[in-house]
């Protein structure tokens, strides 16, 4: 039976897709539909070369998936015919899902219930699942949850110091995100260090427009920076990360902001965007560091916050840290940010290898610390699609 898996990642206004061989890891098709629901809705994909098409004003997830099936896959009938199953990235699974699951009506309801904590993402996931079922009625669908990897966190890590009944009755706790990426990096480090996954202790920094740090002990997540939602933790592209909660009351009561305005500010106007008041693009911050005040300010705050998290998470690993790892768009490509963060961790005996750090960009990987460094730091390209494909193939019986 074919182990080709169609991997779907439905964002609030995007659809990322790939056809992945779960056995070899080869990607036969990759693509992205973006600006969905807007006049400029479009799709880009790679299949025998690069292609791009306009989807039509207002095209949404259903139209994007239909275009992918009827136009892109139709041009490669053998690829479509050999699809074995469909895997869906699901941002939030609440406490119900501790691992990936074959999608049933009950699982679909669980995804809907968890939408309270991911109102932009989970409803889009459900649309993607329903559209996939309609277009491929004979294929099994599997949900792979970003939150599942973090379900091993101890109570001391996931509880907030709020009235306990808020957790027991309403599920208000830390859930964490990027679990699929953190899991992939854990497995990769195990291979690089020639250790069983169950013996790996790392701190992984997944840095992109959304960013999180995860402390991984004996191959399991024991703490992570994102919380109930993806808003908590690090400075991100447009998200604020950690702030004093009373700022919300001050904005509302003293400055007259509405709840909707505050929500929009914290999620879409903060982070690098807020600190620079120019852009959320980390490349601007990196390229103009030391020359433009706004870029310098943003990069210093970003690196300070990240270094604090990494240092703090050493306390969860009980004396052994095998490696600090960097992944994600920024983690894999920004040598200056990696160096600034690691230099702030000099107390741990970390020494950056400047040449190796510069080489580890644009697909380059490897150790970026010297042989004398007490703790190695590594750059590893993440591959969430492969994890989703592997889990899907296993649960679908491919």
From Swiss-Prot:
Family, as annotated: Belongs to the acetokinase family.
Annotated organism of origin: Aliivibrio fischeri (strain ATCC 700601 / ES114) (Vibrio fischeri)
GO molecular function: acetate kinase activity; ATP binding; magnesium ion binding
Residues at which ATP binds: 16, 206-210, 281-283, 329-333
Broad class of enzyme this protein falls into: transferase
Binding site for substrate: 89
One Pfam entry name: Acetate_kinase
Protein name per its UniProtKB record: Acetate kinase 1
BP GO terms, sorted: acetate metabolic process; acetyl-CoA biosynthetic process
Alphabetized SUPFAM superfamilies for the sequence: Actin-like ATPase domain
Subcellular location: Cytoplasm
Cofactor remark: Mg(2+). Can also accept Mn(2+).
Positions that bind Mg(2+): 9, 384
Subunit structure: Homodimer.
Site (Transition state stabilizer): 178, 239
Residues at the catalytic site: 146 (proton donor/acceptor)
Listed EC numbers: 2.7.2.1
């Amino acid at each position: 039976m074919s182990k080709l898996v169609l991997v779907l990642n439905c964002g609030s206004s995007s659809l990322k897709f790939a056809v992945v061989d779960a056995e070899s890891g080869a990607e036969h098709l990759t693509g992205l539909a973006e600006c969905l629901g807007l006049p400029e809705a479009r799709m880009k994909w790679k299949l025998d070369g690069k292609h791009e098409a306009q989807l039509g004003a207002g095209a949404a997830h259903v139209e994007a998936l239909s275009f992918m099936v009827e136009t892109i896959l139709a041009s490669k009938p053998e690829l479509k015919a050999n699809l074995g199953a469909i895997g869906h990235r699901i941002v939030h699974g609440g406490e119900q899902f501790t691992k990936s699951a074959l999608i049933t009506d009950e699982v679909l309801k669980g995804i809907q219930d968890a939408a309270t904590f991911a109102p932009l993402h989970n409803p889009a996931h459900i649309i993607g699942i329903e559209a996939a079922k309609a277009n491929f009625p004979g294929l099994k669908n599997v949900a792979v949850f970003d939150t599942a990897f973090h379900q091993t966190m101890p109570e001391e890590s996931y509880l907030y110091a709020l009235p306990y009944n808020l957790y027991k009755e309403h599920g208000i706790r830390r859930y964490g995100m990027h679990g699929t990426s953190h899991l992939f990096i854990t497995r990769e480090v195990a291979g690089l260090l020639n250790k069983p996954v169950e013996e790996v202790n790392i701190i992984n920094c997944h840095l992109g427009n959304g960013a999180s740090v995860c402390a991984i002990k004996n191959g399991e997540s024991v703490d992570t920076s994102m919380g109930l939602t993806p808003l908590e933790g690090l400075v991100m592209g447009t998200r604020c990360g950690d702030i004093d909660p009373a700022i919300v009351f001050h904005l509302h009561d003293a400055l007259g902001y509405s709840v909707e305005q505050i929500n929009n500010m914290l999620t879409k106007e903060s982070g690098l965007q807020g600190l620079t008041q120019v852009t959320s693009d980390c490349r601007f911050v990196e390229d103009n560091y030391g020359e433009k005040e706004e870029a310098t300010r943003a990069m210093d705050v970003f690196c300070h916050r990240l270094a604090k998290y990494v240092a703090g998470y050493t306390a969860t690993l009980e004396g052994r840290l095998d490696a600090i790892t960097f992944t994600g768009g920024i983690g894999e490509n920004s040598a200056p940010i990696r160096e600034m963060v690691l230099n702030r961790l000099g107390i741990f005996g970390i020494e950056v290898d400047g040449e190796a750090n510069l080489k580890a960009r644009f697909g380059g990987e490897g150790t970026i610390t010297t042989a004398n460094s007490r703790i190695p730091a590594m750059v590893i390209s993440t591959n969430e699609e492969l994890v989703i494909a592997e889990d899907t193939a296993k649960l679908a019986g491919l």
